[in-house]
A protein has these predicted regions:
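Conserved catalytic-core segment of NTP-binding enzymes
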Residues: 5, 81, 86, 171-262
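Beta-strand-loop-alpha "switch" segments that mediate conformational coupling across diverse proteins
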Residues: 12, 238-243, 249-281, 293
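Phosphate-binding loop that captures ATP/GTP phosphates
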Residues: 81-85, 91-141
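Cytosolic-facing regulatory segments adjacent to core modules
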Residues: 127-185
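NTP-binding/hydrolysis catalytic cores, primarily Walker-type P-loop NTPases
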Residues: 280-309
Length: 309
Protein backbone atom coordinates (compact mmCIF):
# COMPACT_ATOMS: atom_id res chain seq x y z
CA UNK A 1 0.00 0.00 0.00
CA UNK A 2 1.49 3.31 -1.09
CA UNK A 3 0.71 5.97 1.50
CA UNK A 4 1.12 9.73 1.36
CA UNK A 5 3.38 11.13 4.08
CA UNK A 6 2.19 14.57 5.10
CA UNK A 7 5.03 17.01 5.63
CA UNK A 8 5.26 19.96 8.06
CA UNK A 9 4.51 23.35 6.54
CA UNK A 10 6.59 26.49 6.55
CA UNK A 11 4.14 29.37 6.74
CA UNK A 12 5.47 32.78 5.65
CA UNK A 13 4.81 35.59 8.09
CA UNK A 14 2.77 37.42 5.45
CA UNK A 15 0.36 34.46 5.33
CA UNK A 16 0.30 33.51 9.01
CA UNK A 17 -2.64 34.94 10.94
CA UNK A 18 -1.97 37.33 13.78
CA UNK A 19 -2.72 35.81 17.19
CA UNK A 20 -4.22 38.35 19.57
CA UNK A 21 -5.77 38.60 23.03
CA UNK A 22 -8.44 40.90 21.62
CA UNK A 23 -11.88 39.28 21.61
CA UNK A 24 -13.57 41.08 18.74
CA UNK A 25 -13.16 42.51 15.28
CA UNK A 26 -13.78 46.25 15.34
CA UNK A 27 -12.56 47.37 11.91
CA UNK A 28 -14.82 47.96 8.92
CA UNK A 29 -15.47 44.97 6.64
CA UNK A 30 -13.27 46.32 3.85
CA UNK A 31 -10.35 46.38 6.31
CA UNK A 32 -11.17 43.11 8.08
CA UNK A 33 -8.13 40.93 8.79
CA UNK A 34 -8.03 37.23 9.59
CA UNK A 35 -6.86 37.01 13.20
CA UNK A 36 -6.96 34.32 15.87
CA UNK A 37 -8.72 35.60 18.99
CA UNK A 38 -7.37 33.97 22.14
CA UNK A 39 -9.39 33.54 25.35
CA UNK A 40 -8.21 35.36 28.46
CA UNK A 41 -7.04 32.14 30.13
CA UNK A 42 -5.29 30.71 27.05
CA UNK A 43 -2.23 28.59 27.83
CA UNK A 44 0.32 27.56 25.23
CA UNK A 45 -0.43 24.00 24.10
CA UNK A 46 1.74 21.16 25.31
CA UNK A 47 2.99 18.33 23.11
CA UNK A 48 1.52 14.89 23.64
CA UNK A 49 3.87 12.71 25.65
CA UNK A 50 4.46 9.02 24.88
CA UNK A 51 1.56 7.00 26.28
CA UNK A 52 -0.71 10.05 26.50
CA UNK A 53 -3.95 10.23 24.53
CA UNK A 54 -6.19 13.21 23.74
CA UNK A 55 -9.71 13.35 22.32
CA UNK A 56 -11.17 16.14 20.19
CA UNK A 57 -14.80 16.25 19.05
CA UNK A 58 -15.87 18.36 16.08
CA UNK A 59 -19.47 19.33 16.77
CA UNK A 60 -22.19 21.40 15.15
CA UNK A 61 -25.93 20.86 14.92
CA UNK A 62 -26.09 22.17 11.35
CA UNK A 63 -24.91 20.42 8.21
CA UNK A 64 -22.62 22.30 5.85
CA UNK A 65 -20.74 24.06 8.65
CA UNK A 66 -17.38 22.58 7.67
CA UNK A 67 -17.43 19.87 10.32
CA UNK A 68 -16.08 17.03 8.17
CA UNK A 69 -13.48 19.27 6.51
CA UNK A 70 -12.28 20.49 9.90
CA UNK A 71 -12.01 16.90 11.16
CA UNK A 72 -9.95 15.72 8.19
CA UNK A 73 -7.67 18.76 7.96
CA UNK A 74 -6.84 18.75 11.66
CA UNK A 75 -6.11 15.02 11.51
CA UNK A 76 -3.72 15.65 8.61
CA UNK A 77 -2.12 18.63 10.37
CA UNK A 78 -1.44 16.58 13.50
CA UNK A 79 -0.10 13.64 11.48
CA UNK A 80 2.34 16.05 9.80
CA UNK A 81 3.42 17.12 13.29
CA UNK A 82 4.46 13.56 14.10
CA UNK A 83 1.35 12.20 15.82
CA UNK A 84 -0.73 9.11 15.09
CA UNK A 85 -4.36 10.13 14.68
CA UNK A 86 -7.49 7.99 14.66
CA UNK A 87 -10.60 9.49 13.08
CA UNK A 88 -14.02 8.29 14.27
CA UNK A 89 -16.64 8.87 11.60
CA UNK A 90 -19.75 9.24 13.76
CA UNK A 91 -21.74 11.08 11.08
CA UNK A 92 -22.91 8.07 9.06
CA UNK A 93 -23.68 8.88 5.44
CA UNK A 94 -22.41 7.37 2.22
CA UNK A 95 -21.07 10.71 0.98
CA UNK A 96 -19.46 11.64 4.29
CA UNK A 97 -16.00 11.40 5.78
CA UNK A 98 -15.60 7.67 5.09
CA UNK A 99 -16.21 8.37 1.41
CA UNK A 100 -13.61 11.14 1.39
CA UNK A 101 -11.02 9.51 3.67
CA UNK A 102 -11.57 5.96 2.51
CA UNK A 103 -10.40 3.07 4.69
CA UNK A 104 -7.69 0.86 3.18
CA UNK A 105 -8.65 -2.72 4.00
CA UNK A 106 -6.14 -5.57 4.25
CA UNK A 107 -5.58 -7.25 0.91
CA UNK A 108 -8.04 -10.06 0.33
CA UNK A 109 -10.37 -9.10 3.21
CA UNK A 110 -13.90 -10.14 2.30
CA UNK A 111 -16.53 -7.40 2.39
CA UNK A 112 -18.50 -9.23 5.08
CA UNK A 113 -15.45 -9.18 7.35
CA UNK A 114 -14.92 -5.43 7.19
CA UNK A 115 -15.86 -3.78 10.48
CA UNK A 116 -17.40 -0.35 10.92
CA UNK A 117 -18.58 1.91 13.73
CA UNK A 118 -21.89 0.04 13.61
CA UNK A 119 -20.12 -3.17 14.70
CA UNK A 120 -18.55 -1.30 17.61
CA UNK A 121 -21.91 0.11 18.72
CA UNK A 122 -23.51 -3.34 18.60
CA UNK A 123 -20.63 -4.97 20.47
CA UNK A 124 -19.63 -7.11 17.48
CA UNK A 125 -16.13 -5.64 17.26
CA UNK A 126 -13.71 -3.70 19.38
CA UNK A 127 -12.53 -0.29 18.25
CA UNK A 128 -9.15 -1.63 17.15
CA UNK A 129 -10.81 -4.25 14.93
CA UNK A 130 -12.73 -1.48 13.17
CA UNK A 131 -9.69 0.78 12.70
CA UNK A 132 -8.08 0.86 9.26
CA UNK A 133 -5.23 2.52 7.45
CA UNK A 134 -5.98 5.42 5.10
CA UNK A 135 -4.03 6.95 2.21
CA UNK A 136 -2.15 9.07 4.76
CA UNK A 137 0.66 7.82 6.98
CA UNK A 138 -0.36 7.96 10.67
CA UNK A 139 -4.01 8.76 9.91
CA UNK A 140 -6.44 5.91 10.65
CA UNK A 141 -10.21 5.72 10.41
CA UNK A 142 -13.13 3.92 12.01
CA UNK A 143 -15.56 4.17 9.09
CA UNK A 144 -19.33 4.40 9.13
CA UNK A 145 -21.99 4.42 6.46
CA UNK A 146 -25.73 5.01 6.21
CA UNK A 147 -26.60 1.64 7.76
CA UNK A 148 -25.02 2.81 11.03
CA UNK A 149 -27.90 5.24 11.49
CA UNK A 150 -30.12 2.34 12.58
CA UNK A 151 -28.39 2.49 15.97
CA UNK A 152 -30.09 5.86 16.49
CA UNK A 153 -33.46 4.12 16.90
CA UNK A 154 -32.52 0.65 18.12
CA UNK A 155 -33.31 0.21 21.84
CA UNK A 156 -30.75 -2.60 22.08
CA UNK A 157 -28.03 0.04 21.67
CA UNK A 158 -28.64 1.84 24.92
CA UNK A 159 -25.36 2.47 26.74
CA UNK A 160 -24.33 6.08 26.19
CA UNK A 161 -20.80 5.26 27.39
CA UNK A 162 -20.20 2.61 24.73
CA UNK A 163 -17.72 4.67 22.70
CA UNK A 164 -15.99 5.98 25.81
CA UNK A 165 -15.42 2.38 26.94
CA UNK A 166 -14.31 1.33 23.45
CA UNK A 167 -11.61 4.01 23.44
CA UNK A 168 -10.45 3.08 26.94
CA UNK A 169 -10.20 -0.58 25.94
CA UNK A 170 -8.25 0.20 22.77
CA UNK A 171 -4.64 -0.94 22.73
CA UNK A 172 -3.71 0.86 19.52
CA UNK A 173 -0.79 3.29 19.98
CA UNK A 174 -2.84 6.32 18.97
CA UNK A 175 -1.94 9.80 20.21
CA UNK A 176 -5.10 11.64 19.18
CA UNK A 177 -8.68 10.60 18.53
CA UNK A 178 -10.74 13.12 16.59
CA UNK A 179 -14.47 12.55 16.23
CA UNK A 180 -16.66 13.80 13.40
CA UNK A 181 -19.88 14.13 15.42
CA UNK A 182 -23.35 13.83 13.85
CA UNK A 183 -25.26 17.09 13.37
CA UNK A 184 -28.50 15.68 14.73
CA UNK A 185 -29.05 15.71 18.48
CA UNK A 186 -29.84 12.10 19.30
CA UNK A 187 -28.31 8.88 20.56
CA UNK A 188 -25.26 8.98 18.30
CA UNK A 189 -24.36 12.52 19.32
CA UNK A 190 -24.87 11.53 22.96
CA UNK A 191 -22.47 8.61 22.53
CA UNK A 192 -19.82 10.89 21.04
CA UNK A 193 -20.13 13.62 23.66
CA UNK A 194 -20.06 11.02 26.43
CA UNK A 195 -16.52 10.11 25.31
CA UNK A 196 -15.34 13.31 26.98
CA UNK A 197 -12.62 15.60 25.70
CA UNK A 198 -12.24 18.88 23.90
CA UNK A 199 -14.95 20.28 21.62
CA UNK A 200 -14.17 22.14 18.41
CA UNK A 201 -17.10 24.09 16.97
CA UNK A 202 -16.93 24.87 13.25
CA UNK A 203 -19.34 27.41 11.84
CA UNK A 204 -19.55 28.55 8.26
CA UNK A 205 -19.58 32.30 7.82
CA UNK A 206 -23.17 32.72 6.67
CA UNK A 207 -26.43 34.30 7.78
CA UNK A 208 -28.01 30.86 8.35
CA UNK A 209 -25.21 29.79 10.66
CA UNK A 210 -25.57 33.05 12.54
CA UNK A 211 -29.27 32.32 13.10
CA UNK A 212 -28.57 28.80 14.41
CA UNK A 213 -25.88 29.97 16.81
CA UNK A 214 -28.07 30.19 19.91
CA UNK A 215 -29.40 26.62 19.66
CA UNK A 216 -25.86 25.36 19.03
CA UNK A 217 -24.51 27.20 22.06
CA UNK A 218 -27.30 25.78 24.24
CA UNK A 219 -26.61 22.23 23.04
CA UNK A 220 -22.93 22.60 23.92
CA UNK A 221 -23.76 24.16 27.30
CA UNK A 222 -25.98 21.16 28.05
CA UNK A 223 -23.18 18.80 27.01
CA UNK A 224 -20.72 20.56 29.31
CA UNK A 225 -23.19 20.14 32.18
CA UNK A 226 -23.59 16.40 31.53
CA UNK A 227 -20.18 15.25 30.32
CA UNK A 228 -16.47 15.83 30.84
CA UNK A 229 -16.06 18.16 27.87
CA UNK A 230 -14.82 21.68 27.26
CA UNK A 231 -15.00 23.90 24.20
CA UNK A 232 -11.49 24.86 23.12
CA UNK A 233 -11.95 26.30 19.62
CA UNK A 234 -14.56 27.98 17.44
CA UNK A 235 -13.60 27.73 13.77
CA UNK A 236 -14.94 30.19 11.19
CA UNK A 237 -14.91 28.14 8.00
CA UNK A 238 -15.04 29.70 4.52
CA UNK A 239 -14.02 33.02 6.12
CA UNK A 240 -13.76 36.17 4.05
CA UNK A 241 -13.67 39.87 4.79
CA UNK A 242 -17.38 40.67 5.08
CA UNK A 243 -19.75 42.14 7.64
CA UNK A 244 -21.31 38.72 8.24
CA UNK A 245 -17.85 37.27 8.96
CA UNK A 246 -17.28 40.03 11.49
CA UNK A 247 -20.70 39.45 13.06
CA UNK A 248 -20.42 35.66 13.27
CA UNK A 249 -16.85 35.83 14.59
CA UNK A 250 -17.69 38.33 17.30
CA UNK A 251 -20.73 36.31 18.38
CA UNK A 252 -18.66 33.12 18.59
CA UNK A 253 -16.20 34.93 20.85
CA UNK A 254 -19.10 35.84 23.15
CA UNK A 255 -20.75 32.40 23.03
CA UNK A 256 -17.51 30.50 23.78
CA UNK A 257 -15.46 32.76 26.08
CA UNK A 258 -13.01 30.00 26.96
CA UNK A 259 -12.28 29.05 23.36
CA UNK A 260 -9.96 30.48 20.75
CA UNK A 261 -11.74 31.82 17.67
CA UNK A 262 -9.93 30.91 14.47
CA UNK A 263 -10.83 31.92 10.90
CA UNK A 264 -10.09 29.52 8.06
CA UNK A 265 -9.95 31.56 4.89
CA UNK A 266 -12.00 30.56 1.87
CA UNK A 267 -10.18 29.34 -1.25
CA UNK A 268 -11.12 27.54 -4.46
CA UNK A 269 -8.81 24.69 -3.43
CA UNK A 270 -10.95 23.97 -0.37
CA UNK A 271 -13.96 23.32 -2.62
CA UNK A 272 -12.02 21.30 -5.18
CA UNK A 273 -10.08 18.88 -2.95
CA UNK A 274 -13.03 16.59 -2.05
CA UNK A 275 -13.77 16.07 -5.75
CA UNK A 276 -10.22 14.72 -6.10
CA UNK A 277 -10.67 12.47 -3.03
CA UNK A 278 -7.79 14.26 -1.34
CA UNK A 279 -7.41 16.37 1.76
CA UNK A 280 -6.89 20.07 1.12
CA UNK A 281 -3.45 19.66 2.67
CA UNK A 282 -2.44 17.10 0.05
CA UNK A 283 -4.24 18.76 -2.86
CA UNK A 284 -3.00 22.29 -2.17
CA UNK A 285 -0.33 22.34 0.55
CA UNK A 286 0.43 26.02 -0.04
CA UNK A 287 -3.16 27.22 0.00
CA UNK A 288 -4.28 29.68 2.65
CA UNK A 289 -6.91 27.20 3.84
CA UNK A 290 -4.27 24.53 4.45
CA UNK A 291 -2.05 26.96 6.33
CA UNK A 292 -4.92 28.21 8.49
CA UNK A 293 -5.85 24.67 9.53
CA UNK A 294 -2.18 23.98 10.24
CA UNK A 295 -1.97 27.06 12.45
CA UNK A 296 -5.13 26.00 14.28
CA UNK A 297 -3.73 22.51 14.84
CA UNK A 298 -0.57 23.97 16.39
CA UNK A 299 -2.61 26.21 18.69
CA UNK A 300 -4.37 23.12 20.02
CA UNK A 301 -1.42 20.70 20.23
CA UNK A 302 2.30 21.47 20.15
CA UNK A 303 4.35 19.55 17.57
CA UNK A 304 5.90 16.28 18.63
CA UNK A 305 9.49 17.49 18.18
CA UNK A 306 8.93 19.92 21.06
CA UNK A 307 8.80 16.96 23.46
CA UNK A 308 12.58 16.90 23.48
CA UNK A 309 12.98 20.68 23.62
Amino acid sequence: MGQVTLEPLKIPDRIRMEVTAEREWTEAANRLRARVLLPAAFAAPAPILPGEHRVFMVFNRKGGAGKTTTTLELACAWAAMGYSVRVLDCDPQDAGLSGWLEPVYPEGMAVENRKTLKDVLYGKAGLDEATYFTRYTNVYIVPSYEDCAVAEYDPSVSSERILRRAIKQSEAPVDITIVDCPPKIGKLSTYTLAIGGKIIVPSQVSALDAKSGESLRQAITDAQDDYDVETVAAVLTAWDATNIAKSVGNQMAVDYPGALVCPVRKTVDARTAPDQMKSIREFAPRSTTTRDFDQLGRLLVAPREEVAA
